Regions:
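Sec-dependent N-terminal signal peptides of Gram-positive bacterial secreted proteins and lipoproteins
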Residues: 4-21
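Glycan-recognition surfaces
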Residues: 249-341, 360, 382, 387-408
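Loop/helix patches that line or flank the sugar-binding groove of alpha-linked glycan CAZymes
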Residues: 266, 330-333, 344-452
Length: 452
């Protein structure tokens, strides 16, 4: 696809026009069936509760599709954090890859969500952690119990227990390994002991992953966000990229339109290399977080021109590894402090402009739920995953309780109920920025040319 040229002058003019009390109507939003979309990241647990148990669920998310889509904010892609059965609140330790966590609903609820998204022109991508499973996954339980049953000195065999081949076991203690209680065996668990690392060199594991991809793609999922790509083979970037190349090829063999975006939490020169795998997108950490390009420009610690020159430079860098790359700019996510805390004494102006800078970058732009309200949340992870701030009313239908270990704190800006009718609110500014992006397809699909 030939990209159009988008100048920094046009970008700045769009930011300024977003300050006016005007916005494109739904009828002017342009829908193009490609992956240069405008995505909204949802942590289902904290988003919207449909049954009053205090935990967000798929039915709750479905009830808010008009808020997310063209009738509301204008997003046309949703990325959900993992929705699979898991013993944790965050659900990155998967116990079953082909089902829905009961806290979130059922497979029938998921099918309904996909259908309702499709009706609205919204595609859905799932967060898929393939680096590790839960220690409660039947694969690991079987392998662990097998090793416990071995006589002292006996050699294990995948012929006796095929799941022994699914994980990385060792008789010797190593960094990043955990002891199997009552044995001299250890298993790789780079994150925590409850997340044993999969053996991604195993053909059996690869066959399982292929079946998982097919299961969800046939249910209407448009793609996947791949967690922790640098950890596929810890310390071996070449092998990690080789595995990602295999995974990308398999996904597109099942569904040529499958979209994949990888989390490669590293410096820009390193994560750019992962485009060699052929993957569609890699998250653009260079512009994200409190020390990223967006926050530095808005805080005035670097010249405003850096925004355009850095985009121009990185577009050339990424294209040198994959000419068909689609950038994945984001500003914050579930692992980062929320952006409202980046700016001292901010009346909302900096929060607004920073959000627009993210939304006016090329590729598929990602916005974390609640950023459109200027929600707060920093420190421990649970605080960064606070309940969506629909209302100040504790009896509001759909309001979630949030993670049990999160601190209780006041928000910096009002709830959605109090912002939606204020034309100068953070919410309405975000809404305008999303709609400008959708109304001008060249923003997502163009090359940046920094002009003096």
């Amino acid at each position: 696809m030939k990209k159009l040229i988008l100048s920094s002058v046009l970008i700045l003019s769009l930011i300024l026009s977003g300050c006016a009390n005007t916005q494109p109507e739904s009828s002017s939003l342009i829908s193009i069936d490609d992956d240069y979309r405008t995505a909204y990241q949802v942590f289902v647990y904290s988003f919207c509760d449909s049954n009053g148990d205090g935990i967000g669920d798929l039915k709750g998310l479905e009830s808010k599709l008009d808020y997310i889509g063209d009738k509301g904010l204008g997003f046309d892609r949703i990325w959900t954090l993992p929705v699979f059965p898991s013993p944790s609140y965050h659900k990155y330790d998967v116990a079953d890859y082909t089902d829905i966590d009961p806290e979130y609903g059922t497979l029938e609820d998921f099918d309904s969500l996909v259908s309702k998204c499709s009706e609205r022109g919204i595609d859905l991508i799932l967060d898929l952690p393939v680096n590790h499973t839960s220690s409660e996954h039947p694969w690991f339980v079987s392998a662990r119990d097998y090793l416990k049953s071995l006589a002292p000195g006996a050699e294990p065999s995948s012929d006796e227990n095929l799941y022994y081949d699914y994980y990385n076991f060792s008789r010797e203690p190593q960094d990043g390994y955990t002891n199997i209680e009552g044995t001299s065996w250890y298993y790789e668990s780079r994150f925590v002991s409850s997340m044993p690392d999969l053996n991604l060199s195993s053909d059996r594991v690869k066959n399982e992953l292929e079946e998982i991809l097919e299961f969800w793609l046939k249910r209407g999922v448009s793609g996947f966000r791949l967690d922790a790509c640098t950890s596929f083979y810890t310390g071996d970037r070449t092998k990690s990229i080789e595995f990602l190349t295999w995974l990308n090829a398999k996904a597109k063999e099942i569904d040529p339109s499958c979209y994949l975006v990888g989390e490669v939490w590293a410096d820009q020169a390193s994560y750019a290399l992962y485009y060699e795998s052929g993957i569609d997108s890699v998250f653009d950490f260079q512009f994200s977080g409190a020390e990223g390009n967006i926050a530095r420009v808005v805080n005035g610690t670097v010249p405003a021109s850096l925004y355009a020159t850095a985009m121009e430079s990185e577009e050339k860098l990424y294209a040198s590894y994959n000419e068909n790359y689609i950038n994945a700019p984001f500003y914050t996510n579930h692992d980062m402090a929320r952006s409202a805390g980046y700016y001292a004494w901010d009346d909302g102006t900096k929060t607004k402009i920073a959000g627009a800078l993210n939304l006016l970058m090329g590729g598929c732009s990602y916005t974390y739920y609640g950023e459109e309200l200027g929600m707060k949340g920093s420190g421990k992870d649970e605080n960064k995953r606070a309940p969506m701030y629909w209302s100040d009313d504790p009896e509001y239908i759909g309001l979630c309780g949030g993670p049990k270990e999160m601190d209780r704190f006041e928000m910096k800006f009002p709830s959605l109920e109090n912002q939606q009718n204020d034309p100068l609110s953070v919410f309405n500014y975000y809404k305008q920025a999303v709609r400008i992006r959708r109304a001008y397809p060249q923003i997502a699909r163009g090359w940046t040319v920094a002009e003096a």
